[in-house]
């Protein structure tokens, strides 16, 4: 007796379709992981999304919840398992797993807790997706990107930290608020550590090619009557503020991760401030990962843009590197 499906459909093709070339895995289905997942889905970036976590019930529930929205998405396959075989042949793997930053806790304080988690995660990712591009989002992101690079054995162009992509977005949002202009037309870069020692490049801040330091030479200094310095302070404080108010950050960092995935998967060659190995640049001598403007495309991080920094900006960047190295050198990998 023929089934309903057999009565409805005549199968024509004998060929098994090839797997997707744009598969994305998100490791960790916490607030950040799910914000990244939904942002990636809503941008139509992937034909297959895989989710992995150690918490099986939470993982199953999140996957079901997304699958129930399949009608509203263009991603035909959403899979989830605690077994990493589900991640096989991913093009991009977004790592958001790790211990969560507590109220008042610095990102650097999180570090050894998350290093131990990475020792399990990274080898499993590489086992099933040896050709993937790793996008590290877990904090402290710069140190954990270094850790992922060391543990994975991947070339540096395929290990990227989300870095100050979000800090720069926050900066441009606040700059836009101050000027009454959309953030996409407010150009400013925050580089260095994703965290307390990040460096705002005031010398490059511009709108429509008009450099604001040309209009206000004191911009970013203590002498500035308009107190633009407070814009960067708000960038640094914003995560702490959001954590204090709602307990965690999720939406903006999720959108930031999807933004980076888009540049990679669509081969856009867009320039982003992301965390990469900066040894030998801007006077940094240690093997640290920090954010500088990088071009992202199909093979990962293809180029680094050499910023023209003022001496005080370069000094701050070196100080940022020293802060990270101080923590990094004592890690047990």
From Swiss-Prot:
It comes from the Eukaryota. It is found in: Cytoplasm. Substrate binds at residues 107, 139, 170, 249. GO terms for cellular component: cytoplasm. SUPFAM superfamilies: LDH C-terminal domain-like, NAD(P)-binding Rossmann-fold domains. GO terms for biological process: lactate metabolic process. It holds the Pfam family Ldh_1_C. Its EC number is 1.1.1.27. InterPro entries: L-lactate/malate_DH (IPR001557), L-lactate_DH (IPR011304), L-lactate_DH_AS (IPR018177), Lactate/malate_DH_C (IPR022383), Lactate/malate_DH_N (IPR001236), Lactate_DH/Glyco_Ohase_4_C (IPR015955), NAD(P)-bd_dom_sf (IPR036291). Pathway: Fermentation; pyruvate fermentation to lactate; (S)-lactate from pyruvate: step 1/1. Its main location: cytoplasm. GO terms for molecular function: L-lactate dehydrogenase activity. Belongs to the LDH/MDH superfamily. LDH family. This is L-lactate dehydrogenase A chain. It comes from Cyprinus carpio (Common carp).
């Amino acid at each position: 007796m023929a089934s309903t499906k057999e009565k409805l459909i005549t199968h024509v093709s004998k060929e098994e379709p090839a797997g997707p070339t744009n598969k994305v895995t998100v490791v960790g289905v916490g607030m950040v992981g799910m914000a990244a997942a939904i942002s990636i889905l809503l941008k139509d970036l992937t034909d297959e999304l895989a989710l992995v976590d150690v918490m099986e019930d939470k993982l199953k529930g999140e996957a079901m919840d997304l699958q129930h929205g399949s009608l509203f998405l263009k991603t035909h396959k959403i899979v989830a398992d605690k077994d990493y075989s589900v991640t096989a042949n991913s093009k991009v793997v977004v790592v958001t797993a790790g211990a969560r930053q507590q109220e008042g806790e610095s990102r650097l304080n999180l570090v050894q807790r998350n290093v131990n988690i990475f020792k399990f995660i990274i080898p499993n990712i590489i086992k099933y997706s040896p050709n993937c591009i790793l996008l590290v989002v877990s904090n402290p992101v710069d140190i954990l990107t270094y850790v992922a690079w060391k543990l994975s054995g991947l070339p540096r162009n395929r290990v990227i930290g989300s870095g100050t992509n979000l800090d720069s977005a926050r900066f441009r949002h606040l700059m836009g608020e101050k000027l009454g202009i959309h953030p996409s037309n407010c150009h400013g870069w925050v580089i260095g550590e994703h965290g307390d020692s990040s460096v705002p490049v005031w010398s490059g801040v511009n709108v429509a090619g008009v450099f604001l330091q040309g209009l206000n030479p004191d911009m970013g200094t203590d002498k500035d009557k308009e107190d633009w310095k407070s814009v960067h302070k708000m960038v640094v404080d914003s995560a702490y503020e959001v954590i204090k108010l709602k307990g965690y950050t999720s939406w903006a960092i999720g959108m930031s991760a999807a933004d980076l995935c888009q540049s990679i998967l669509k081969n856009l060659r867009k320039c982003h401030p992301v965390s990469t190995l900066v040894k030998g640049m801007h006077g940094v001598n240690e093997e640290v990962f920090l954010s500088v403007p990088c071009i992202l495309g199909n093979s990962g991080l293809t180029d680094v843009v050499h910023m023209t920094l003022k001496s005080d900006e370069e000094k701050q960047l070196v100080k940022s590197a020293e802060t990270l190295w101080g923590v990094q050198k004592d890690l047990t990998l």
